[in-house]
Amino acid sequence: KRYLIFLIFFVPLFYKSDSLEKFLISFQWKPFNVVETKDSIYGKITVLKNEDAVDFYENSSKVYSTVLSAKNEEITHLPLFLSYDCKNILLLGGGLHNIREILKYPVKKIVYVEQNPVLVELLKKHSDDRIMSLWENPIVKVISTDGRFFIKRTTDIYDCVILDVSPPLTGLANRYFTKE
């Protein structure tokens, strides 16, 4: 009965208000500091800050962090080391740390395809100076479109394609691992 009284009096205060949503989101992400949330057609993107790191989550799954991980080095260095004289690189997903690792090689062009334009917008907005320089690098081209769609439509030839997407556990992710 107390909860019903609470609902009757307090829910109308939050009706059509962002404050209830902000409260619920900050409660969901405790103890992290929620910097921003934004909806896209691919899901809700949440930007969290914890100490020196800024982390980006899409539908509650971490998709990018401003802290470099060993995963970024593994994903980029292995194919570039095994390939000979790669000048034109296509990077599907994975974020800016992969670009930073690729730039350690004498490449001429990096095309970074990120499906979610809202994620790209938030990455640019919440990047520090070190990361921001990657966005402004003249050999880096960022394209916001579906990676598989891009591969089917491009006429460019790439010396190396680096795929940094989710494992093929869902139909959406499996598209990158099939011929159909």
Predicted regions, residues:
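The AdoMet/dcAdoMet-binding core of the Class I SAM-like
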Residues: 69-180
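Basic, ligand-binding patches in group-transfer machinery
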Residues: 2-63, 69
